[in-house]
Structure formats: C-alpha cells, structure tokens
C-alpha cells in the first residue's frame, strides 16, 4: 500500500528498558543497525501493525511490553535514488512512519528472538544509550530518528532535566 505521494505507511518501534537504554538491532547479514520497523497492511491500524511487526521481527508479544507513547505525526523519509525500485508500480519513494515507544518488561528480555515469521530481519541486538541511534543510523533515516527520539525523550528518560530554551539575543550584545 503506497499513498498518492509515493510513501509507504510504516510503523517504527523504539523499545526501551528501565535504564533509559534502547534496543538496537543489526539487519540480517549486514553491518547496519536500526530500530524494528515494518509496513502497515491494508485494513490494519498502526497499533495492530506495530504488534505484528514486534512479533515477526523481535519475537515479542503484546504482553511483553507497555506502550508509553505514539508519535504525534507521521514522519517521512525519502529513499536514496539507488534504492528506489523504479520498475515497481506504484513507485515507492520513501516511508511515512507512525512511531511507538515501548517499555520492555525486564523479565521478558529472554523472549527476544529472531525469525519468528520467515526470514529474520535481524541477527543481533544490544542495549545502547538513548541518543546513540541518532548518530549511527543510515543517513537517510537520521532526521526521522532525531525527531522521534526528541519527541520521546521526556517519556523514555523522565529523570533528565528539560532541555533549556535558548535565550533571545538582545541587540548590541554578543
């Protein structure tokens, strides 16, 4: 399912633990790492798609996690031209994503497994510091990651002080 602008509806999943770390997964047979994500099927809500993808990609079930937040908006990224499948119709130029912040029940960490549904998407995972993915994700996804992590920060890490607002500059002062 691709919308009229060429974007495929998709869900992104940020899974955090009680230490404010996030689950970072390595794509199967590759050196690139990312958050779990996947398409929204026809007739499926974003939340239904998120739980389906959570199980298919990570092996976790609805009872293993708690939804802490959902992104306010759909966030879009464009694929690099070299990754666009021009022969497919309709042409998909990128993804629009609804993001979910989940907290994993500490006792359920052992339930993480790959390949619960066909070919696995990932072959390894680890806990990383909250902002690490923004610096490490493939460049064309970086702005979406930055925006979603900024939106979820206060919920994922409530012990952090709020971001200070920039003081307005007064004329004549540097």
From Swiss-Prot:
Q: Which family does it belong to?
A: Belongs to the Nudix hydrolase family. RppH subfamily.
Pfam families, A to Z: NUDIX
EC number(s) per entry: 3.6.1.-
Q: Biological process GO terms, please? A: mRNA catabolic process
Q: What does this protein do?
A: Accelerates the degradation of transcripts by removing pyrophosphate from the 5'-end of triphosphorylated RNA, leading to a more labile monophosphorylated state that can stimulate subsequent ribonuclease cleavage.
The molecular function GO annotations come to: metal ion binding; mRNA 5'-diphosphatase activity
InterPro entries to which the protein is assigned, alphabetical: Nudix_hydrolase, NUDIX_hydrolase-like_dom_sf, NUDIX_hydrolase_CS, NUDIX_hydrolase_dom, RppH
> What is this protein called in UniProt?
RNA pyrophosphohydrolase
Q: Which residues form the Nudix hydrolase domain?
A: 6-150
- Which organism is the protein's source? Tolumonas auensis (strain DSM 9187 / NBRC 110442 / TA 4)
Position of the signal peptide = none
Q: Where is this motif: Nudix box?
A: 38-59
The beginning of the lineage is: Bacteria, Pseudomonadati, Pseudomonadota, Gammaproteobacteria, Aeromonadales
